[in-house]
């Protein structure tokens, strides 16, 4: 998020989390949960989507984490298609033009966009930076910005979703920078 005033940093990996930085200062909030968007309910959940997701470890139903974390992505795929694949196998299927994997990844991007639309509508960040293992899927960046535009309140969304610069070490670098 270098060079931006309002940054929403996202982790999509084993879990889902986030952080907010305004004018290069991390915003923690009264309860120190600022940016904890993994436990908002996926906006606009359909009955079909409710069928193919497990209850979140936090005890609630429909948390974004159960849809867009790596384990959530593979769990939803396995429930829908009666398989036992991990996210890497699903992505391999996508690369090989396997129909179920293509469907799953397009749905993943839609779920990610719906979750990020809440962030955009409330925070209106300059940029959203994705990190974590799932952020390494290049197909996300080919589609997420256009998909996000369908769900935000404005017709002229300027916020961009971008990949982190430092790869899997981005979180460690950020923590070190803050200490």
Identify the residue ranges that each predicted region occupies:
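Glycine-rich phosphate-binding loop of actin/hexokinase-like ATP-binding domains
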Residues: 4-64
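ATP-binding/phosphotransfer module of carbohydrate and carboxylate kinases, centering on a glycine-rich
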Residues: 1-4, 44-179
């Amino acid at each position: 998020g270098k060079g931006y005033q309002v940054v929403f940093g996202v982790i999509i990996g084993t879990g889902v989390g986030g952080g907010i930085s305004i004018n290069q200062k991390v915003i923690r909030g009264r309860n120190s949960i600022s940016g904890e968007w993994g436990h908002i309910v996926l906006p606009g959940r359909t009955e079909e989507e409710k069928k193919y997701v497990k209850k979140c470890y936090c005890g609630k139903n429909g948390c974004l984490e159960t849809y867009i974390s790596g384990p959530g992505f593979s769990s939803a795929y396995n429930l829908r298609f009666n398989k036992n694949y991990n996210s890497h196998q699903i992505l391999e299927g996508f690369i090989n033009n396997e129909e179920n994997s293509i469907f799953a990844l397009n749905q993943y991007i839609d779920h990610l966009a719906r979750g990020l639309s809440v962030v955009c509508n409330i925070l209106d960040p300059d940029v959203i930076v994705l990190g974590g293992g799932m952020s390494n899927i290049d197909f996300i960046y080919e589609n997420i910005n256009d998909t996000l535009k369908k769900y935000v309140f404005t017709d002229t969304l300027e916020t961009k979703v971008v990949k982190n610069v430092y790869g899997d070490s981005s979180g460690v670098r950020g923590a070190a920078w803050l200490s």
